[in-house]
């Protein structure tokens, strides 16, 4: 039996991290990075308590892993003044993301999955236009600006150092596989936990080093997001579907 790959998950207590821990358990060995909220985990999981803003600790956390799923993000902006939240984005989504990519390079990590966001192309959505992986970023807020930096950094590390980098533009992710039968705003941007985990697995198992941007969204979003490249890049198609408008 082939030895299982070791996967470092940053932001492992978050919604996406929790979904990966649930659906990818048994397929990968986990090293889980938590900031301060540590949930109940399995005994075989490796635990790291740290902050992605600490470069030396990120280099240490990435030692000996095959891949990294970088899911750590700035907390919700609700309740924070704009200037303070923007500084949080710089610290987490810009400085922290640089630390992860550089730690991957230093340790010879082969693959990085970067939790990006449809916020990068949010202005296209506002204008009723189709968002594609190729269009020029038009972030709807400073969070989207931070994510655009991460994608550009991932492209740089692929081109210069040969890392496989997959930027998943995660859309509406409540970490559930259950869809209300009644349509609600945001359901046409919905990504199921199952689809998210399977997309991550497809990225981890892709055979050749490459850079890719993929919209993480389940079926029913065709008028907003172009996900046609996901099948060619990593062999992924969503299985689940959000509720349709009446």
Which stretches of residues belong to each language-model region?
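Glycine-rich NAD(P)-binding loop of the Rossmann-fold in SDR/ketoreductase-type enzymes
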Residues: 53, 88-99, 145-146, 191
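N-terminal Rossmann NAD(P)H-binding glycine-rich loop of SDR-like oxidoreductase domains
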Residues: 7-27
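Catalytic helix-loop patch of NAD(P)-dependent Rossmann-fold dehydrogenases
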Residues: 87, 91, 128-165
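Alpha-helical substrate-binding/gating segment
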Residues: 170-177, 190-211, 219
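Conserved C-terminal active-site "lid" loop/helix of NAD(P)H-dependent oxidoreductases
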Residues: 212-214, 219-237
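Conserved catalytic Lys-bearing alpha helix of Rossmann-like short-chain dehydrogenase/reductases
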Residues: 94-100, 109, 146-154, 196
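NAD(P)H-binding glycine-rich loop region in Rossmannoid oxidoreductase-like domains
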Residues: 38-39, 45, 49-92
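Conserved Rossmann-fold NAD(P)-dependent oxidoreductase catalytic core, especially the SDR/UDP-sugar
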Residues: 99-138
């Amino acid at each position: 039996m082939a030895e299982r790959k070791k996967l470092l998950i940053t932001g492992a207590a978050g919604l996406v991290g929790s979904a990966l821990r649930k659906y990818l358990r048994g397929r990968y060995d986990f090293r889980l990075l938590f900031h301060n909220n540590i949930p109940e985990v399995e005994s075989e999981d490796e635990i790291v308590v740290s902050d992605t803003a600490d470069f030396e600790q990120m280099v240490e956390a990435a030692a000996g892993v095959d891949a990294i799923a970088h899911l750590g993000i700035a907390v919700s902006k609700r309740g924070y003044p704009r200037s303070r939240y923007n500084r949080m984005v710089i610290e987490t989504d810009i400085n922290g993301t640089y630390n992860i990519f550089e730690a991957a390079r230093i340790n010879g990590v082969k693959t990085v999955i970067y939790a990006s966001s449809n916020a990068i192309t949010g202005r296209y959505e506002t204008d009723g236009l189709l968002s594609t992986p190729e269009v020029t970023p038009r972030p709807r807020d400073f969070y989207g600006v931070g994510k655009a930096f991460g994608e550009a950094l991932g492209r740089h590390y692929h081109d210069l150092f040969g890392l496989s980098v997959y930027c998943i533009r995660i859309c509406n992710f409540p970490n559930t596989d259950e869809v209300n039968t009644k349509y609600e705003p945001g359901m046409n941007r919905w990504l199921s936990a199952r689809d998210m985990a399977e997309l991550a697995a497809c990225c981890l198992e892709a055979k050749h080093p490459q850079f890719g941007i993929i919209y993480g969204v389940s079926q029913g979003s065709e008028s907003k997001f172009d996900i046609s490249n996901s099948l060619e890049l990593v062999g992924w198609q969503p299985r689940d579907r959000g509720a349709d408008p009446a």
